[in-house]
Amino acid sequence: LINKNAACLEDKYRQLVDSLENQGVEVVIPGNGQTESDNIWYEEFLAMKILIDFVDNVEEAIDRINTYSGGHSTAILTENNETATEFMEQVDSAAVYHNASTRFTDGGQMGVGAELAISTDKLHHRGPLGLEQLVTNKYYVYGDGHIRD
């Protein structure tokens, strides 16, 4: 989800799409004939595929994510710490990231050891699941463009 009011939106958007497509990522944009309904928002792609849409503000992004997300991990890329804090506190995901890749949502990376499974449920544990996770947790991860290879 991209804020419609972002500075230099057209140039940054075109650069993003070109970069993704050059890496072999299929870019899906609602409303341009690629998707017939809102059902695509519920789909987990499990492929080099991304869904891009625009929102008016962070509140709309939070609402969209909380409506359609599976609750595993969610990230925001912004230099505005207030916006990031609001996003991270309001998004209903097991792990929330500010300027870091969601690929860090892994048992070894989160310090719980080898994963037995992944849970997005709120009863007992959400996120990477190890033997000691018997309470609900929400992980807050802050970065500066960090990725995981």
Q: Which residue ranges define each predicted feature?
A:
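NAD(P)-dependent aldehyde/semialdehyde dehydrogenase
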Residues: 1-101
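C-terminal segments
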Residues: 79-149
